[in-house]
């Protein structure tokens, strides 16, 4: 059972933003652009130059406490001013987190376990967090770093890739969907088609990261912003459809400003997993953000149109709409209109996590009276795709 929509979502937002700042510090430090000797704990500094930061043995076996992570970010304020365009927002967010948590390291309940930036060329960065209070292990994907990297070339590409349909869905699907669903090739390759020299897939690495905590009774959460949201969607789908007995269901995914991930066949399979109770997905986006409308389509006919999945929390300045998607073609028309007509500045303004947080704060009281389990039990919302709930 989730706590409430606001608390669950805002913590995922904070994690998504902090993974940006933490990654920037590590990458600049590795490249020699920053001296981190005075701002990182010695035991962390000893490991940070590796592609993979494993801190599970710190904190009496709990990992690097979230408060310790915050202290690292705060200690690097001057460094972050040089490399973090939204430094003022990060500083305000940290103050807010510290006020909400109102705890020192001795009472910490959230810990960073591993942090991986496997390939500098593709910028696939993720962290694994352990929440001892709520018994959750969360995979946090970092999103696109700026509008000129390969990350955004991947976001804007429209090629499709066949992803194997989970075995447990085959009896409920027809035709080609029994074999595969079509998803965004670039997003797929980040996680599932990237064998390194040792033959490891990032997906396998993530499984190895989370399995010890799942075996201790932890539930699995996934989150990310922008590109990170797309990766979170695919990982959640893969985990929810897995026949591995140790993976608990449902998988919970809360994403921010996700671009399209798959076609209508992917949506059909995803919705079936929702109906089976294997996945719970809240896809949060700002009205007027262009990124959730790209890429609107690949080459081909209607079955090549991209479709969104999950319950959508669409945020406005003074309201919100909760809806579940459908396949009636309206999404395509709306996506093309939005992506063509909206100016570039709207991406910068409305794509920011700061705008997401401001709008969620404006609706905090209403969102705190909802939770994701109840939304999925609401037949008006989930059972009848064309309906929506407004706030």
Where are these regions (language model features)?
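Non-catalytic, mobile gating and regulatory segments of ester bond hydrolases
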Residues: 1-223, 227-391
């Amino acid at each position: 059972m989730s706590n409430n929509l606001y608390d669950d979502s805002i913590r995922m937002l904070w994690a998504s933003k902090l993974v940006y700042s933490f990654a920037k510090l590590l990458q600049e430090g590795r490249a020699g652009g920053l001296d981190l000797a005075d701002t990182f704990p010695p035991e962390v500094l000893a490991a940070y130059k590796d592609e993979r930061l494993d801190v599970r043995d710190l904190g009496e076996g709990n990992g690097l406490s979230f408060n310790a992570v915050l202290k690292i970010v705060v200690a690097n304020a001057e460094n972050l001013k040089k490399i973090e365009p939204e430094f003022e927002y990060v500083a305000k967010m940290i103050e807010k987190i510290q006020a909400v948590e109102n705890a020192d390291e001795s009472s910490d309940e959230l810990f960073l376990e591993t942090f991986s930036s496997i390939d500098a060329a593709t910028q696939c960065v993720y962290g694994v967090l352990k929440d001892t209070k709520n018994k959750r292990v969360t995979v946090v994907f970092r999103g696109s770093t700026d509008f000129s990297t390969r990350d955004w070339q991947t976001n804007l590409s429209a090629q499709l890739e066949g992803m194997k349909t989970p075995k447990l869905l085959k009896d409920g699907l027809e035709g080609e969907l029994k074999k595969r669903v079509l998803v965004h090739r670039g997003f797929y390759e980040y996680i599932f088609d990237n064998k390194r020299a040792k033959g490891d897939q990032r997906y396998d690495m993530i499984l190895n990261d989370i399995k010890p905590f799942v075996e201790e009774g932890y539930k699995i959460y996934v989150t990310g912003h922008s590109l990170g949201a797309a990766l979170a969607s695919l990982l959640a789908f893969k985990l929810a459809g897995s026949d591995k007995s140790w993976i608990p269901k449902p998988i919970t995914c809360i994403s921010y400003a996700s671009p399209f991930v798959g076609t209508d066949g992917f949506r059909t399979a995803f919705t079936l997993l929702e109906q089976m109770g294997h996945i719970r997905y809240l896809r949060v986006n700002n009205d007027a953000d262009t990124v959730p409308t790209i890429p609107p389509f690949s080459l081909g006919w209607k079955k090549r149109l991209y479709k969104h999945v999950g319950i959508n929390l669409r945020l406005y300045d003074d309201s919100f709409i909760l809806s579940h998607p459908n396949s009636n073609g309206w999404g395509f028309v709306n996506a093309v209109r939005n992506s063509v007509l909206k100016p570039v500045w709207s991406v910068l303004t409305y794509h920011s996590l700061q705008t997401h947080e401001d709008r969620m704060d404006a609706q905090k009281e209403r969102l705190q009276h909802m939770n994701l389990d109840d939304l999925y039990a609401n037949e008006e919302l989930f059972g009848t795709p064309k309906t929506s709930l407004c706030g």
